[in-house]
Amino acid sequence: MAAKKKKQVTLHVPSAPFRPGDKASFAPFENEPGDLPRPNPIKCTASETTDHAYGLVRVLDFDGNASGPWDPELTPDELREGLEHMVRMRIFDDRMMKMQRTGKLSFYMRSFGEEAVAIAQTMALENQDWIFPTYRQPGAQFVRGRDMVSMINHCIGNVEDNVKGRQMPVHYTYRDGRFISVSSPVGTQFSQAVGVAMASQYKALDECCITWIGDGSSACLLYTSPSPRDS
C-alpha cells in the first residue's frame, strides 16, 4: 500500500501594500464622494440605508477635499478644534501608556487611530445628548470639557478620583458631560443606550443617545442573541 504523500505546510505572512513614507494609491476604491445618496436622517426607512451599511460612504476625494452631499461644511475654527482634541488625545494616550508600562497604572487601553471617531461624533451632538462609550472613546470627554488631570486621577485611582477607586482604570465616568460609566463587559453599552433613549422618548425630551461597537462587542452574546420577540 502506497504511503500517503504528506501535504506541504506553508506559511503566508500578509504584508501591507504601502508602508509609512510610500505614496498610497486608492485606485481600488471605485466609489466617488456622493455615489451613495444622503437620506433624510429623520424620515428615511431602513431599506433606504441598506447600501450604506454594506457599502462605502466617501466624503473626501483623493486630494483630501470634502465634497458631495456628505460634506459637513465645517468652518476652519471647527476643524482646528477637532484637530486640537485629537492631538491632545494622542499625547494623553502616549503618556498614560508609559505610566502603565512602568507599573504606575494597573491597566490602560489606547484609542490610537480611532481618535476622530469619538471626537467628531461628540462635536456633532448637543450638550443634552448622552454618551455611552467603550474603552476607545475617552476623547469625547475633551469635547465635553473634562480636563486631563481629572482623567489621570481616575486612572491612578487616587483620592481625587471621581469614582473613588470603584472602577478599573480607563472606565471613565463624567456626569457633567453626560458621559456614562464604561462597563468592563463589552456590548453592554447598547442595552444601556436603548434604555435611556426609550426613557427620553417617553418623556418627550429633546435628547439622543450615542454608542459605539467594535469587533469584540459584535461577537458577544449581548449583541448577537435574539430578543424574545424574534424567537
Give residue spans per PLM region.
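Cofactor-binding active-site loop characterized by glycine-rich and histidine/acidic residues
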Residues: 91-94, 98-225
